[in-house]
Swiss-Prot record:
Coiled coil: none annotated. It comes from Brucella suis biovar 1 (strain 1330). One of its GO terms (biological process) is amino acid transport. This is Leu/Ile/Val-binding protein homolog 8. The keyword Cell inner membrane does not apply. The lineage of its organism: Bacteria, Pseudomonadati, Pseudomonadota, Alphaproteobacteria, Hyphomicrobiales. Residues 1-26 form the signal peptide. Belongs to the leucine-binding protein family. Keywords: Amino-acid transport, Signal, Transport. Component of an amino-acid transport system. InterPro entries: BCAA_transport, Leu-bd, Leu_Ile_Val-bd, Peripla_BP_I.
């Protein structure tokens, strides 16, 4: 009897070990590399939530090629740590690909590591030209770019804001200010180029460190130059600082156009007050107050977000990362496997038409592995909410102008 029990126990142990081993084989590990601490943590965490929701969705549907997706997280608090975390995820954890990263500077640093290792890197939030401009073989970007953001800023000024103010856009003076990392520099450069190509007047283009604690001299310079339109590309803290110090100085340009970042965040509006931010424009990723006929799946995304995190999404960064990750997962599910070249082949074959994602744009990788169908939208803060006002097919409100 005792021997029988031992044999049964041994057999059961082998069976359980075999099951555990099989389960381990049925997991595919991906890296999730975002700034989740430090000055970029708020938008980094918001971006990571989109990836997490895409993973939840694909796992609920049976995983990718029958394998459960497991996210291994890394904290890209600065460029050095982004590089170190990429090495750890690849060498020690053994991830098949890395997803991230929100910050242009962080992904530029980290993707050098993945490229040398031959591991695919999917960027779903950083906009700087240099992200894809280096011609890396294993880096793909699903989201819109700095050029998209700049073009939408200028187009919105010419086609909507200037007519709404009763102005000829060529009579308006534009001041371009920006945080001086790869993100802000790229957007500002394209804004200047687009404005000048359209015959508009740029009276100031000036960068500053994103961690600045005083923008009063920049406010004064804008005022002295007579800038009646300000385009600012910024993170949250510098968005708040500029709006507050411009208000304190009594500087009231006819229009402020944010370039995503802090201008797309509800916490920014709450920090400066709804009376102050109302009327401010923003060119950025698809947000939530939008015509949902142009963004199929957006309502379901918001419901899933609220169920998991207990609040409304804080910006469109989570949505953009969700859409990007979901598209990549779709490609991998149709692919041959998880070896680097198999992953690259699968995503290069991806072809999602416009109007079939929750962000509204399609996905197809073109030159330098950039999603050539990615686009941005134009929003305005109205009654404390960021609502879509441009383009017309996605708008749910008309532009408002203060008298």
């Amino acid at each position: 009897m005792r021997l029988s029990r031992l044999l049964i126990g041994a057999s059961l142990g082998v069976a359980l070990s075999s099951t555990a081993f099989t389960a381990a084989l049925a997991d595919v590990k991906f890296g999730s590399l975002y700034p989740i601490s430090g000055s970029l943590a708020l938008l980094g965490e918001e971006s990571a939530r989109g990836l997490e929701l895409a993973v939840d969705e694909v796992n609920a549907a049976g995983g990718i090629k029958g394998e459960k997706v497991v996210l291994e997280r890394g904290d890209a608090v600065d460029n050095n740590q982004a590089t170190g975390e990429a090495r750890r995820l690849i060498s020690l954890v053994g991830v098949k690909a890395i997803f991230g990263t929100y910050s242009s500077a962080r992904v530029i640093a980290a993707s050098q590591v993945s490229e040398l290792a031959g591991i695919p890197y999917f960027e779903m939030g950083a906009v700087a030209d240099e992200v894809t401009g280096r011609g890396l073989q294993y880096l793909f970007r699903t989201n819109p770019t700095a050029e998209n953001m700049a073009k939408d800023s200028v187009d919105m000024l010419i086609k909507g804001i200037a007519p709404g103010l009763g102005k000829d856009p060529k009579d308006m003076k534009i001041g371009i200010i920006y945080e001086d990392s790869s993100y802000g520099t790229s957007v500002a450069g394209h804004q200047e180029d687009n404005a000048k190509a359209a015959g508009l007047t740029v009276v100031l283009k000036s960068g500053y460190p994103s961690n600045t604690v005083d923008m009063s001299s920049l406010v004064l310079e804008l005022r002295e130059k007579g800038a009646d339109v300000v385009m600012q590309t910024s993170y949250q803290n510098d968005s708040v600082l500029f709006l507050q110090q411009a208000n304190e100085a009594g500087y009231k340009p006819l229009a402020i156009i944010g370039g995503g970042g802090g201008y797309s965040m509800q916490p920014t509006a709450d920090a400066v007050g709804h009376d102050l931010i109302d009327g401010v424009f923003d060119a950025d990723y698809t947000q939530y107050a939008v015509n949902t006929s142009a963004t199929p799946g957006l309502t379901e995304f918001v419901e899933a977000y609220k169920a998991k995190y207990g609040s409304q999404p804080r910006s469109g960064h989570s949505l953009t990362n969700y859409v990007g990750a979901k598209a990549i997962f779709q490609a991998l599910n149709a692919g041959e496997g998880f070896e680097p070249d198999q992953i690259v082949s699968a995503v290069k074959a991806l072809d999602i038409p416009d109007g079939q994602t929750a962000a509204g744009y399609g996905v197809k990788f073109g030159k330098n592995n950039q999603n050539e169908r990615a686009t941005m939208m134009g929003m305005q803060w109205q009654d404390g909410k960021l609502v879509t006002v441009y383009p017309e097919n996605a708008a749910i409100a008309k532009m408002r102008f203060k008298k």
